[in-house]
């Protein structure tokens, strides 16, 4: 068991000497442990608890109702236990995904952009709680990215220039209790996005893999280098002990790409516990139309179109979902040509 480093974010990041020093410390923590914690204040804690409570209430609803909270326009909505697959094996959490909530009158929705549409909210309380929680997470995400840029001695807005009107989204998860035949909640993988900020209840079950000297890490954004299932049964894995009044933060694939591997996307997995477990994973992301580039080689040719990357990842994860079928039916991938 490792005691994770915990940091307090300033209310505003302005590029001061203290900001630069904190940015360097964040980078060093990720490079050493793969994950860090940030302190949360009373308002953030209240919104975290309200989101968790809304999730618990939703998960008590009948499966027929939960399964109706889907859309063929967006990947927002309900995912049943076992519907999601990692490395060929089913994952067992119930999930409600919250992507950008766009009305059908939005020009991008009317134009048939892939993944764009309204969230199929189960009720107003759930909608209000999740949006308020994501608002707090988004503010923290912007500060973290500014500090990271300063820590690398880059212009303060290097990363946040890409996250203007970002495709921020969240996975709201419920893990069932373990059984004699089911102990893995989610298999080992890295996350496809820029920065992951997560909250969990007091049950526990998350494990992360820290950077290991000399270990080759796949570039999960490339078709032939999936990280799904890698190192599943190979030490070391760090158990992320539930701690009150913190959020955990780790880099995703896009940040690994942009920093030329100076920050690695953190592999993680979830083991089921003896009780049900609730968690939220928020992804602070680039704009759907943004192109990520390598910040230490800005003149290079390598680019990742974020929207195409996101769409590809979700289509791969949910090949039979009505959203994926609609993308194929309407040839919505033509948007990226």
Curated annotation (Swiss-Prot):
GO MF assignments: 2-oxoglutarate oxygenase/decarboxylase (ethylene-forming) activity; dioxygenase activity; metal ion binding
Biological processes annotated in GO: ethylene biosynthetic process
Cofactor names: Fe(2+)
UniProt keywords, alphabetically: Dioxygenase, Ethylene biosynthesis, Iron, Metal-binding, Oxidoreductase, Plasmid
Catalytic activity: 2-oxoglutarate + O2 + 2 H(+) = ethene + 3 CO2 + H2O; L-arginine + 2-oxoglutarate + O2 = guanidine + L-glutamate 5-semialdehyde + succinate + CO2
Pfam family of the protein (one): 2OG-FeII_Oxy
Enzyme class: oxidoreductase
Pathway linked to the protein: Alkene biosynthesis; ethylene biosynthesis via 2-oxoglutarate
Residues binding Fe cation, per UniProt: 189, 268
Record domain Fe2OG dioxygenase: where: 166-286
Cystine bridges: none
InterPro entries cross-referenced by the UniProt entry: DIOX_N (IPR026992), IPNS-like_FE2OG_OXY (IPR044861), IPNS-like_sf (IPR027443), Iron_ascorbate_oxido_reductase (IPR050231), Oxoglu/Fe-dep_dioxygenase_dom (IPR005123)
Family annotation (PANTHER family): 2-OXOGLUTARATE (2OG) AND FE(II)-DEPENDENT OXYGENASE SUPERFAMILY PROTEIN-RELATED
Function: Simultaneously catalyzes two reactions, namely formation of ethylene and of succinate from 2-oxoglutarate.
The protein's name in its UniProt record: 2-oxoglutarate-dependent ethylene/succinate-forming enzyme
Organism encoding this protein: Pseudomonas syringae pv. pisi
Lineage of the organism: Bacteria, Pseudomonadati, Pseudomonadota, Gammaproteobacteria, Pseudomonadales
């Amino acid at each position: 068991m490792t005691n994770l480093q915990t940091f307090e974010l300033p209310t505003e990041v302005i590029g001061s000497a203290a900001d630069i020093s904190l940015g360097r410390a964040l980078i060093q923590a990720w490079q050493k442990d793969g994950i860090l914690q940030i302190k949360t204040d009373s308002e953030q804690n209240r919104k975290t608890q309200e989101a968790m409570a809304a999730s618990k209430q939703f998960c008590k609803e009948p499966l027929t109702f939960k399964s109706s909270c889907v859309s063929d326009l967006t990947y927002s909505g309900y995912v049943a236990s076992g519907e999601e697959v990692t490395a060929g094996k089913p994952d067992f959490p119930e999930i409600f995904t919250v992507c950008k909530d766009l009305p059908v009158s939005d020009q991008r929705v009317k134009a048939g952009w892939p993944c764009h549409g309204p969230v199929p909210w189960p009720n107003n309380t759930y909608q209000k709680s999740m949006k308020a929680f994501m608002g707090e997470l988004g503010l923290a995400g912007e500060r973290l990215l500014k500090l990271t840029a300063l820590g690398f001695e880059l212009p303060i807005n290097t990363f946040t220039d890409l996250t203007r009107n970002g495709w921020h989204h969240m996975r709201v998860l419920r893990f069932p209790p373990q059984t004699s035949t089911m102990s893995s909640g989610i298999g080992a993988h890295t996350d496809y996005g820029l920065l992951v900020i997560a909250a969990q209840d007091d049950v526990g079950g998350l494990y992360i893999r820290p950077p290991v000297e000399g270990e080759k890490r796949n570039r999960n954004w490339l078709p032939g280098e999936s990280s799904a299932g890698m190192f599943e049964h190979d030490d070391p894995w760090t158990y992320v002990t539930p701690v009150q009044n913190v959020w955990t933060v780790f880099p995703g694939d896009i940040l690994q790409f942009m920093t030329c591997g100076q920050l690695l996307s953190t592999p993680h997995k979830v083991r089921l516990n003896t009780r049900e477990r609730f968690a939220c994973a928020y992804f602070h992301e680039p704009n759907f139309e943004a192109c990520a580039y390598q910040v230490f080689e800005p003149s290079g040719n390598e680019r990742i179109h974020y929207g195409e990357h996101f769409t590809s990842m979700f289509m791969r994860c949910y090949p039979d979902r009505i959203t994926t079928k609609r993308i194929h039916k309407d040839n919505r991938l033509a948007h990226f040509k």
